[in-house]
Amino acid sequence: MGRFRGGLRCIKYLLLGFNLLFWLAGSAVIAFGLWFRFGGTIKDLSSEEKSPEYFYVGLYVLVGAGALMMAVGFFGCCGAMRESQCVLGSFFTCLLVIFAAEVTTGVFAFIGKDVAIRHVQSMYEEAYSDYVRDRGRGNGTLITFHSAFQCCGKESSEQVQPTCPKELPGHKNCIDKIETIISVKLQLIGIVGIGIAGLTIFGMIFSMVLCCAIRNSRDVI
């Protein structure tokens, strides 16, 4: 009986430690998602009328999952401390929802990467063509692109030189820069999503083991 209670206490503390880590991870995920959405390249592109909204879907899901992670982390601590099977069962269900959301984010980031790259490149191509035909059209859009991606023009920057960043050292092809930057950012989002999904698996295992241990301890009593 003493060993059983000791094992139950050990599982409970493991779950408490997991929930603390999960709460901190949720805070980090929210900060990460908001930084990606409202900072740097993405912030500049979002000001454009033709900015691809689907490009942000993965980030919105990531931020939402982060907020849910923080709430669930607190919820899980309460369930572990009270040794409540009902609360632990609800905690498991919430983790399952987070797992599905994070896997969706990761898969969306990896699968939708090429589509997002082509869409942003086509936006740049259109703004570039408008500016070449008429210097009054596409001017603001090109400046936004060149500033966000720190690039200038395509094969050459001569036709769009007035819209290029003054501090830019030499010529950098925007088509190539768009592909590189978006690819890296979406891969990072995908890795974070899959990583958090992997973390939730441990939480689900701990919660089910503790729930079963609590039920068995009550049966023994």
UniProtKB/Swiss-Prot annotation:
Tissues expressing this chain: Expression is restricted to the nervous system.
Subcellular localization(s) per the UniProt record: Membrane
Extracellular-facing ranges: 35-54, 112-188
Keywords assigned: Glycoprotein, Membrane, Transmembrane, Transmembrane helix
Pfam (any one): Tetraspanin
Top-level lineage group: Eukaryota
Membrane-spanning residues: 14-34, 55-75, 91-111, 189-209
GO BP terms in the entry: astrocyte development; axon development; inflammatory response; microglia development; myelination; oligodendrocyte differentiation
Glycosylation sites: 139
Cytoplasmic side: 1-13, 76-90, 210-221
Major site of localization recorded for this protein: membrane
CDD domains: CD81_like_LEL
Topology class, membrane: Multi-pass membrane protein
GO cellular component: myelin sheath; nucleoplasm; plasma membrane
Gene3D superfamilies: Tetraspanin
Function noted in UniProt: May play a role in signalling in oligodendrocytes in the early stages of their terminal differentiation into myelin-forming glia and may also function in stabilizing the mature sheath.
UniProt family annotation: Belongs to the tetraspanin (TM4SF) family.
Name of the molecule in the record: Tetraspanin-2
Organism: Rattus norvegicus (Rat)
Higher taxonomy: Eukaryota, Metazoa, Chordata, Craniata, Vertebrata
